[in-house]
Curated annotation (Swiss-Prot):
One of its GO terms (cellular component) is host cell plasma membrane. The gene is rIIB. It is found in: Host cell inner membrane. Keywords: DNA replication, DNA-binding, Early protein, Host cell inner membrane, Host cell membrane, Host membrane, Membrane. It comes from Enterobacteria phage T4 (Bacteriophage T4). One of its GO terms (molecular function) is DNA binding. This is Protein rIIB.
Amino acid sequence: MYNIKCLTKNEQAEIVKLYSSGNYTQQELADWQGVSVDTIRRVLKNAEEAKRPKVTISGDITVKVNSDAVIAPVAKSDIIWNASKKFISITVDGVTYNATPNTHSNFQEILNLLVADKLEEAAQKINVRRAVEKYISGDVRIEGGSLFYQNIELRSGLVDRILDSMEKGENFEFYFPFLENLLENPSQKAVSRLFDFLVANDIEITEDGYFYAWKVVRSNYFDCHSNTFDNSPGKVVKMPRTRVNDDDTQTCSRGLHVCSKSYIRHFGSSTSRVVKVKVHPRDVVSIPIDYNDAKMRTCQYEVVEDVTEQFK
């Protein structure tokens, strides 16, 4: 189960209810709550896990999983489904499986089966689970549900995201450049705290291993605190790392501040602007422990664009 800090229990329950109605896509729900699609997926996955029966097994058991899933046939009468061109939701014996064109390679085939009233086949297609017994690429090794970098096991929110993407059949290798960039950070505390920032689920990782965050600035693009740093689109803003406070118990202190989407609504004024910034994981110095790990202090970032209209 995922620990989702940026949404209340009631908000998560409402997301599950609306998504199950078939009237909203994951992206629409993400825009509504001001979070990422990853957050919505985790909410839905938690809901699925909560419905599954708990089984206790004792004794010595050996299990071997490969990429070909064996699925028991299901009776048509046990299947409830909703579908559109943008999403599919199929419930079998109280367990719900969701798919979108971006998350399931067989989306169109499943949709065609539902339209043709071939519910058993559609349920089987959407329920295919893929697992990798062993994966090795460069310094990264995934084995037995664990990730190792240079033979050292890593446990973190980032690792959870990689393993989750692998389970869904998504491109989990996309995260490796980010992992390598992160390990360039000289602060072990910053590395660990950045994983907490990722768990906030508002973080978009780029192909070159950076990540996007957000910043509230004045109407003239200068920073709100000192009015000395120009945050106009295209600018690279930086300061010596040694001048950034690395104490994550201090909320407001020295450093270049950026935040997640969920923090934007708690800050700024009617004349403020919001800019999207690109940050190298190496340049993260500290993440204050308040506000659900939703903001951080860095020593450098690049301003990508003005996104004020997205937050109105």
